[in-house]
Regions:
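N-terminal small/polar loop signature for handling phosphorylated ligands or for N-terminal nucleophile
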Residues: 1-26, 126-140
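Structural motif
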Residues: 1-3, 24-26, 62-64, 192-195
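Short, basic, helix/turn surface patches
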Residues: 1-7, 52-60, 254-263
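A glycine/threonine-rich phosphate-anchoring loop and its flanking beta-alpha core
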Residues: 19-113
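Generic secondary-structure signature for well-ordered alpha-helical cores
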Residues: 49, 69-73, 88-96, 118-129, ...
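Active-site segments that bind and position negatively charged phosphate/pyrophosphate groups
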Residues: 103-216
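C-terminal charged capping/lid subdomain of soluble metabolic enzymes
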Residues: 207-277
Length: 277
């Protein structure tokens, strides 16, 4: 058997090894930054740190040992970023499934994805405060479980035939585009950038209500709300947008995401940010 102990990349490495060696994997997440401990996919990277491809397995880890008394003493930035990656699951899966009649298990996953969003709005801010104080509160536990368990269950249910279609979207496409800049890849966390990408997704989708909710939530906990927060300038935008629209993450979308849509979304985000300083 193989024990996958650590964060997302360590866990994904051990899971991939388990798949290749045909050994059962048991996971022990030490941070709450993603759902790697419970899901049946590993994210593979190139040697320069850029995204390569997802590597799917037949089964998730046999068991995940989640010890909140350990996780509470890890750096808060990991759960902070994990929150952004988790609420993305709701928006990306529901938009991907819009106007479709998916098979039951996919529909179940899309329906469950709401639990990747609403509990974090309720508990996320206090959970971060409690972690800073070393307190394993109800809010902290609910946030940890949303990040590690709920998101993984949704991920497994909405992944059909080892294709990522319902399992990703514009938020992740923006993340992969941003991390093509070495200083961003090295200086920012996955969920932090995905959370920023969700703001753009909501603007492209003309979902003003949820945009305002997510913007205010991001602002309240320090997740990115503008270009400066992710260290890009107006001069970088063309490259970011070009890369974003080339990502397969937006292939399964109810409409084509164009460069013009993204340009307008970036403009709207900056204008909204300037008016809410």
């Amino acid at each position: 058997m193989i024990f996958a102990i650590g964060g997302g990349k360590a866990t994904d490495t051990a899971k991939a090894l388990g798949e290749m060696a045909k050994k059962p994997v048991f996971s022990v997440p030490t941070i709450a930054s993603n759902c790697a401990a419970c899901t049946s996919v590993s994210i593979m990277y190139n040697e320069d740190g850029s995204f390569k491809n997802p590597f799917f397995f037949e089964k998730p880890p046999v068991h995940a040992f989640i010890q909140t008394s350990v996780i509470v003493h890890t750096p808060t930035k990991y759960m902070w970023a994990g929150i952004g990656d988790t609420y993305a699951k709701y928006f990306e899966s529901t938009i991907s499934a819009r106007g479709e009649n998916p098979v039951h298990y996919v529909a179940l996953g899309v329906g469950m994805s709401r639990l990747c969003y609403e509990p974090l709005l309720l508990y996320g801010k206090k959970a971060l405060e409690d972690q800073k104080n070393g307190v394993v509160s109800y809010e902290f536990e609910q946030t940890v479980l949303s990040i590690i368990v709920t998101t993984a269950i949704v991920s497994i249910l909405v992944t059909t035939e080892h294709i990522i279609d319902y399992n990703t979207g514009l938020g992740h496409a923006v993340y992969y585009a941003l991390t093509s800049f070495p200083h961003i890849e090295e200086g920012h966390l996955h969920g932090e950038l995905v959370g920023f990408g969700i703001l753009l997704l909501l603007l492209v989708d003309h979902d003003e209500e949820n945009f305002r909710k997510v913007y205010e939530f991001n602002k309240s906990i320090g997740l990115p709300t503008c270009l400066a927060d992710v260290e890009i300038t107006a001069a970088d935008l063309d490259a970011v947008i070009e890369k974003t629209v080339s990502m397969k993450d937006i292939d399964h979308n109810p409409y084509v995401v164009t460069k013009e849509m993204l340009t307008e979304a970036f403009r709207e985000l900056e204008a909204y940010h300037e008016s809410h300083l």
